[in-house]
UniProtKB/Swiss-Prot annotation:
Primary residence: cytoplasm
A biological process from GO: ribosome disassembly
Species for this entry: Kineococcus radiotolerans (strain ATCC BAA-149 / DSM 14245 / SRS30216)
Keywords, comma-separated and alphabetical: Cytoplasm, Elongation factor, GTP-binding, Nucleotide-binding, Protein biosynthesis
SUPFAM superfamilies linked to this entry: EF-G C-terminal domain-like (SSF54980), P-loop containing nucleoside triphosphate hydrolases (SSF52540), Ribosomal protein S5 domain 2-like (SSF54211), Translation proteins (SSF50447)
PANTHER family: RIBOSOME-RELEASING FACTOR 2, MITOCHONDRIAL, TRANSLATION ELONGATION FACTOR G-RELATED
Gene: fusA
Pfam families, A to Z: EFG_C (PF00679), EFG_III (PF14492), EFG_IV (PF03764), GTP_EFTU (PF00009), GTP_EFTU_D2 (PF03144)
Protein name: Elongation factor G
Superkingdom per UniProt: Bacteria
SMART domains noted in UniProt: EFG_C, EFG_IV
Sample GO molecular function, one term: translation elongation factor activity
Length: 700
């Protein structure tokens, strides 16, 4: 690797490629790797040969599941690419990729425009304030419409698009693009050398008026941002390409607007100008805000880490992946300082020492060893034992904890039973490894049945995890039916509930008296439980108060309606009493547990279920059937709109009603409709449905 790229961070771009499933994201990444000289044969997704899709299931299903990190070079600049999945079950992968990126390329299907998952990923990028450029792909596709797609970016995403290119031709006759900055045409003729050569030409006469119109819009928009440019523009002078680029770069990095480019990655057209745009408009590590962390053990003390080799070392682990030879690869983004392979660092999140065995820069699943990791770059580390996703690694003398990531709770679970005793041991290893890799994959043991329960973000998510257990860990197991993660909550407050725990059996007994109030708590911000110590006058000794809290939390693991975990409760300890000899932490914990149960019974407990935001895109002929079917699944239709010759139906539907939906939708629409769904919120289960669930749980 060129030394100047390591030290000159203006020549580094850490980017993600983000999109809806099937918008052509992996193909676009493949073309980038081809033109930057890393891939000699282009891998096609539909051949199962794409380089970035390196897990066996990805190559079979043609969708990207794991964000592999890849390094390549273009025009003297190093581009580190994180490939992100476009399927909603894998939002955790998208979330953790965006957290460590400086910029992104949003890929859109030129026929479909903004699709449901494009919207989800866009919102996640907004959350982390990631600057973006847009690539309208598949311009060779039947029905492709560049201006329709640009319109959906504005209408559905509420973003300001800035057109930087115009397509030359469309569908089969798509031949290239008009570059509005330099006012020239770039054309790719035929398949010679896989699109590596393009011709710079005069703008075709039939496009000249349109090109002048959009060039004027571009110049006017950038002139508004700078007084010197505005003066020049109002004086009738044209702006130079360099002036336009500098102004667009500034606007893009501030996320004020989003430059739009177009092409067809599959047909090898338009990829190189998009790579130029990555360098011209997306930020280097020096252009983004410095990383803010906090002191270990004290979140109120802020510590800033700048992307500089002279700063103390700090890095964030954003992905853990199993590797066939090295055991475990930990992907990190280094935010400050330098660290050499073989060094000892501290996992400041967990307070554990770690030794970095080897360091690599990755090309998909191939490793390129390096001697040291430097600020602003992305690496894979070997040898870290304790580190998991979201942990901070830092210099042991100057520790810092960087802002971590938030992951959604799983909404679906299945029971899994190993077929033989040998499988039992292998299952344990498989589950441990997979849980290290994926924070949204959770495991628990059902105390009553002894079954292992695995939980995830959707049916596809669990399917793939089970598939990986079979392939990678050779576990043969029976998998049960998917189960919904119900919750329980309360609908009204109970102002006073007393409980006395008293036990006398010779010797010292047990005594604890508590009085609590409970009230419903809004869970919209992710707070599911709050404990308030409102005891006055030392009626409950201070050392026993955490025990009451622990007892209440333990009771919340099992609700009174059907035994599902309780959420949305604010509990206040308002009074109580202790005995000098017989009181203990255990006595107060038991009292806390029992008083909550009693109070919840009086607080109108109800069952909650996960509700999914469902979007169905269907030909108009099947609209009635699709809506009727969603209504029959207790769905609430939120909206219906026209999109590129089809209808888009948005609805909220309980997850329990969505099992097997893919097959039903296929048969109702002859395979012509597509849908996506993701978790939206928890809502109260209607009484008649709740009664059925309770009966089932009780085995009636």
């Amino acid at each position: 690797m060129a030394q100047d790229v390591l030290t000159d961070l203006t020549k580094v771009r850490n980017i993600g490629i983000m999109a809806h499933i099937d918008a052509g994201k992996t193909t676009t990444t493949e073309r980038i790797l081809f033109y930057t000289g890393i891939n000699y044969k282009i891998g096609e997704v539909h051949d199962g040969a794409a380089t970035m899709d390196w897990m066996a299931q990805e190559q079979e299903r043609g969708i990207t599941i794991t964000s592999a990190a890849t390094t390549c070079f273009w025009e003297g600049t190093q581009i580190n690419i994180i490939d992100t999945p476009g399927h909603v079950d894998f939002t955790v992968e998208v979330e953790r990729s965006l957290r460590v990126l400086d910029g992104a390329v949003a890929v859109f299907d030129g026929k479909e425009g903004v699709e449901p998952q494009s919207e989800t990923v866009w919102r996640q990028a907004d959350k982390y304030d990631v600057p973006r450029i847009c690539f309208v792909n598949k311009m060779d596709k039947l029905g492709a419409d560049f201006f329709f797609t640009v319109g959906t970016i504005s209408d559905r995403l509420g973003a300001e698009p800035l057109v930087m290119q115009l397509p030359i031709g469309a569908e089969n006759s798509f031949a290239g693009v008009v570059d509005l900055v330099h006012m020239r045409a770039l054309t790719w003729r035929g398949e010679v050398q896989m699109g590596a050569d393009y011709t710079v030409e005069e703008i075709p006469a039939d496009l000249l008026d349109q090109a002048n119109e959009y060039r004027a819009k571009l110049v006017e928009r950038v002139a508004e941002t700078d007084e010197a440019l505005l003066e020049k523009y109002l004086g009738g002078e044209d702006l130079t390409p360099e002036e336009i680029k500098a102004a667009v770069r500034k606007l893009t990095i501030n996320s004020e607007l989003y430059p739009i480019f177009c092409g067809s990655a599959f047909k090898n057209k338009g990829v190189q100008p998009m790579l130029d745009a990555v360098i011209d408009y997306l930020p280097s590590p020096l252009d983004v805000k410095p990383m803010i962390g906090h002191k270990v053990g004290d979140e109120s003390v802020e510590i800033i880490r700048k992307p500089d080799a002279t700063e103390p070392f700090s890095a964030l682990a954003f992905k853990v992946a199993a590797h066939p030879f090295f055991g475990k690869l930990t992907y990190v983004r280094v935010y400050s300082g330098v660290v050499a392979a073989g060094s000892q660092v501290v996992n400041s999140t967990k307070g554990k020492k770690e030794r970095i065995g080897k360091l690599f820069q990755m090309h998909s699943n191939k490793e390129n060893p390096v001697d040291e990791a430097r600020a602003g770059h992305i690496y894979a580390m070997i040898g870290l034992k304790e580190t998991t996703t979201g942990d901070t690694l830092s210099d042991s003398a100057q520790q810092v904890v960087l802002e971590s990531m938030t992951f959604p709770e799983p909404v679906i679970s299945v029971a899994i039973e190993p077929k033989t005793k040998g499988d039992q041991e292998k299952l344990g290893t498989a589950i441990q490894r997979l849980a290290e890799e994926d924070p949204t994959f959770q495991v628990e043991l059902d105390q009553e049945t002894g079954q292992t329960i695995i939980k995830g973000m959707g049916e596809l998510h669990l399917d793939i995890l089970v598939d990986r257990m079979k392939r990678e860990y050779k576990v043969e197991a029976n998998v049960g039916k998917p189960q919904v993660a119900y919750r329980e909550t309360i609908r009204r407050a109970v102002l006073k509930e007393d409980y006395v725990h008293k036990k006398q059996t010779g010797g010292s007994g047990q005594y604890a008296k508590v009085q609590v109030s409970i009230e419903p708590l809004d869970t919209a911000d992710g707070t599911f439980y709050e404990f308030v110590n409102a005891v006055t006058g030392g009626r409950v000794p201070r050392e026993y108060i955490p025990s009451v809290d622990n007892g209440i939390q333990e009771a919340m693991q099992e609700g009174v309606v059907a035994g599902y975990p309780l959420v949305g409760i604010k509990a206040s300890l308002i009074d109580g009493a202790a005995h000098d000899v017989d009181s203990s932490e255990m006595a107060f914990k038991i009292a806390g547990k029992m008083v909550l149960r009693e109070a919840v019974r009086k607080a109108q407990p109800v069952l909650l279920e996960p509700v999914m935001a469902v979007e169905v895109r269907t030909p108009a002929d099947y609209m009635g059937d699709v809506i009727g079917d969603l209504n029959s699944r207790r769905g609430q239709i939120e909206s219906m709109e026209d999109v590129s010759g089809a209808k888009l139906v948005k609805a909220s539907v309980p997850l329990s009603e969505m099992f097997g939906y893919v097959g039903d939708l296929r048969s109702k629409t002859q395979g012509r409709a597509v849908y996506s769904m993701q978790f939206s919120n928890y809502a109260e289960v209607p009484r008649n449905v709740a009664d059925e669930i309770v009966k089932k749980v009780r085995g009636e």
